[in-house]
Regions:
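Conserved G/P- and acidic residue-centered "switch" motifs that form tight phosphate/ATP-binding loops
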Residues: 29, 121, 273
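C-terminal soluble domains/tails of integral membrane proteins
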Residues: 238-296, 301, 308, 314-332, ...
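Juxtamembrane/interface alpha-helical elements of multi-pass membrane proteins
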Residues: 1-75, 79-95, 190-253, 259-268, ...
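Membrane-spanning helices that line or support transport/gating and their immediate boundary helices
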Residues: 130, 203, 207, 211, ...
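Membrane-interface, cytosolic juxtamembrane amphipathic helix immediately N-terminal to a transmembrane helix
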Residues: 83-105, 112-160, 277-313
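Short cytosolic helices in intracellular loops of multi-pass membrane proteins
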Residues: 108-112, 222-225
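Bilayer-spanning, highly hydrophobic alpha-helical transmembrane segments
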Residues: 144-202, 296-338
Length: 338
């Protein structure tokens, strides 16, 4: 059974490319249903999601609902794949959002944007073009965050194996460090304590990495969708209700702080006589920039914070599992030779 990664594009840039090409086709006068069909038959854009959506919309199914149905199916199959693979679905759900999760959020965002454009009477092509630009900015921010995290994550994985290296080093020197660990009382104490410290270090590292990984998969999306709604001529109240419905239908996460800021943007627009759509898109860009900067700051902080489990857990475990058995073996051989 294929994993969910094969069912949706592998990067946000690919999702953005699909959205941008849809915008170009629609701007050229191609009907929405035909646009999806053309993309599904294009070798450069073939993927399971586009193909599945194209097949369903040909029968007259609502496009936004079709995208959401496809995402629900992919998520359900992914859950089944995870259970069949190793039964660790629960731990994966608690982990930080993966690239596949970010891509799924992008597709759900597309469904929400499509729904808002249709309901608000906004032209689909400009709305999708703006959304594709938002996805590319989001992809860039996510790449920057993951790049900043790569160093600390590699460090966290590397330091955990240091105690094992210590044990192998003792064996290479000709000492029975393994026998000392499992066959003597002091060795067993060192073994149990060292393993507990290693387990604590691994849990600690994973929690810190998870806390430093961006969790908002679609920052600024609420402002993007409101910009689409008001650009179609919808009133402020109508735009808010339409976007709220779109979020509820699509399952996208709503940032409560962003919802509060929306009123300030509309108030500024009315007082200054500036188009609300322009201000909303500007606010969405600002939120994405801040999210990217925050992710980079967390990654930089993580590089320092990882020294805590290294000093408090890994190094003591290294002493208990690598150095202490070696010393015990030396003492044992020395005493035995007297």
């Amino acid at each position: 059974v294929r994993s969910s990664r094969s069912r949706i594009p592998e990067s946000l840039d690919q999702v953005a490319s699909v959205v941008e090409k849809l915008a170009v086709l629609l701007a050229a006068g191609v009907a929405p249903t035909a646009a999806w069909t053309y993309l599904a038959n294009s070798p450069s854009d073939v993927n399971d999601t586009v193909t599945a959506v194209a097949k369903r919309v040909e029968s007259g199914t609502n496009i936004a609902d079709t995208i959401l149905h496809r995402m629900d199916d992919a998520a359900e199959r992914a859950r089944g794949d995870d259970w069949q693979a190793n039964g660790r679905r629960l731990s994966r759900r608690r982990a930080a959002p993966t690239t596949a999760a970010a891509n799924e959020a992008a597709w759900r965002g597309l469904a929400a944007a499509w729904f808002v454009a249709i309901e608000a009477g906004a032209p689909l092509a400009p709305a999708l073009r703006e959304f594709s630009s938002s996805l590319r900015a989001l992809a860039q921010a996510r790449r920057a965050a993951l790049t900043a995290l790569s160093g600390p994550v590699a460090t966290a994985k590397l330091v955990v194996v240091l105690p094992v290296v210590g044990i192998l080093f003792g064996v290479a020197l000709g000492f029975d460090t393994v026998g000392t660990l499992v066959a003597t009382l002091p060795g067993l104490v060192c073994l149990v304590t060292g393993l507990v410290l290693l387990w604590a270090a691994r849990v600690w590292n994973r929690r810190m990495v998870r806390a430093a990984t961006p969790t908002d998969l679609t920052p600024g999306l609420v402002f993007d969708l409101l910009a689409v709604a008001v650009s179609g001529g919808a009133s402020i109240d109508k735009a808010k209700s339409t976007v709220a419905t779109a979020f509820e239908r699509s399952g996208c996460a709503v940032d409560s702080d962003g919802v509060v800021e929306v009123d300030g943007v509309f108030d500024l627009s009315q007082r200054a006589g500036v188009p609300a759509a322009t201000l909303l898109r500007s606010e969405a860009d600002r939120i994405r920039r801040e999210a990217s900067s925050a992710a980079e700051r967390k990654a930089a902080t993580l590089a320092v914070a990882l020294m805590l489990p290294l000093g408090l857990c890994v190094l003591p475990a290294f002493m208990l599992l690598g150095v202490a058995p070696l010393m015990l073996s030396v003492l044992s051989s020395t005493v035995g030779g007297l």
